């Protein structure tokens, strides 16, 4: 009997594996990845229209790099973009004393080109070099900032959390602060550039790479939010920070962590804003396999990028097995009390289902605010109508300013 039971179990396991493989193959057949020529055409279009992930890139620089790329080899891709960026980096270095404004502009240009050279994740030696160069170029650019950018290193589980802290100039006392968390393929450098816009309101920011991305010390797991709890511990030690007025902002995958923190750390958070937060359906096998392969909203390599950031995942089968445990429904978190939240999303999002935003809105103990673009895609973005920078400056920053009790012009609001 035991032998028969064993055979039955083996047969059931094989059936499950075959079904999963068949499902994945069918999904990949239905949603083919872009060819190299299609990637080039779409990337140039996005550069011309200020669309992610080519916001701020000169189309001429992109075309120059593409002229040297003949295959989808990751190192070839990185080398082509580094060759273009290196020229701006060298010019910037030579101009720092004689023409600092031009040098700074060149550093920005080099940083953005290097960053696209490592995009979406530094999954090869060449892309790792491009990422290292991007960090170097960004920090060279940040040297021109006033108030300055502080590179913070927080000891954490035998390693360190690297973050960027920037505080308003000449603040009369402790200031409110936003903990900004990157997404799957964005980085703390991008967040730091964007969140500079909040400084005039008298609000500081601390930008950090999410688990599995950038310089983060750990990968994604159901307990990886402990990394951000450690950041909050650190911020509590800074006399320049108002401990009672700390908010969180998370973008896409960073919005997942923002949502978890709104619940797990609600006692230490004044408010949390999230853009396109993955909550539950996103983590289910059927949705994952249908949305990640050949997703036209994502430029390329969506599934490989995800597989690279999750702890214990080395294959598609691993990801299918591990993804469901990240669901906030499975973790029994959604019904719990949370900090006040703003949920930003697009009804036409093909990367994170809009139903996850609605699920988050309809759970918890306090009313949540939402900005849903019925014509918007991921993060609520809509080409030429609601591009990323406009959503950030017209929707997210005003909400954070209001929730942190600050009036326009950086004056304290009377609450």
Model-found features: residue ranges?
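Alpha/beta-hydrolase active-site loop
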Residues: 219-240
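Mobile cap/lid helix-loop segments that gate and shape the active-site cleft of serine hydrolases
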Residues: 289-333
């Amino acid at each position: 009997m035991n032998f028969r039971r064993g055979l039955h179990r083996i047969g059931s396991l094989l059936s499950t594996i075959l079904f999963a493989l068949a499902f994945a193959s069918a999904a990949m057949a239905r949603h083919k990845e872009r060819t190299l020529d299609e990637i080039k055409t779409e990337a140039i279009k996005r550069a011309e229209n200020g669309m992610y992930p080519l916001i701020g890139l000169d189309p001429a620089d992109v075309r120059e790099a593409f002229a040297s790329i003949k295959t989808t080899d990751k190192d070839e891709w990185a080398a082509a973009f580094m060759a273009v960026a290196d020229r701006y980096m060298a010019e910037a270095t030579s101009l720092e004393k004689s023409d600092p404004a031009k040098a700074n502009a060149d550093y920005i240009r080099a940083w953005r080109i290097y960053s696209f050279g490592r995009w979406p994740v530094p999954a090869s030696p060449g892309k790792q070099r491009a990422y290292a160069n991007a960090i170097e170029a960004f920090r060279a650019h940040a040297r021109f900032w006033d108030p300055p950018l502080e590179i913070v290193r927080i000891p954490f589980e035998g390693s360190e959390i690297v973050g960027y802290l920037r505080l308003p100039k000449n603040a009369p006392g402790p200031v409110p602060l936003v903990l900004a968390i990157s997404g799957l393929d964005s980085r703390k450098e991008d967040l730091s550039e964007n969140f500079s816009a909040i400084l005039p309101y008298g609000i500081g920011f601390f930008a950090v790479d999410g688990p599995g991305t950038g310089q983060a010390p750990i990968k994604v797991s159901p307990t990886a939010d402990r990394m951000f709890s450690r950041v909050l511990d650190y911020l509590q030690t800074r006399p320049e920070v108002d401990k009672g007025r700390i908010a969180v902002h998370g973008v896409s995958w960073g919005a997942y962590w923002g949502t978890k923190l709104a619940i797990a750390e609600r006692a230490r958070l004044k408010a949390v804003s999230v853009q396109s937060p993955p909550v539950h359906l996103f983590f289910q096998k059927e949705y994952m396999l249908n949305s990640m392969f050949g997703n036209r909203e994502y430029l390329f390599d969506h599934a490989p990028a995800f597989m690279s950031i999750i702890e214990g995942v080395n294959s598609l089968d691993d990801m299918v097995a591990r993804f469901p445990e990240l669901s906030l429904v499975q973790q029994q978190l959604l019904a719990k009390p949370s900090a006040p939240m703003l949920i930003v999303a697009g009804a036409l999002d093909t990367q994170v289902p809009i139903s996850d935003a609605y699920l988050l809105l309809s759970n918890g103990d306090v009313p949540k605010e939402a900005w849903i673009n019925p014509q918007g895609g991921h993060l609520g973005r809509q080409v030429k109508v609601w591009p990323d920078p406009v959503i950030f400056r017209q929707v997210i920053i005003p909400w954070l300013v209001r929730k942190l009790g600050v009036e326009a012009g950086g004056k304290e609001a009377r609450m």
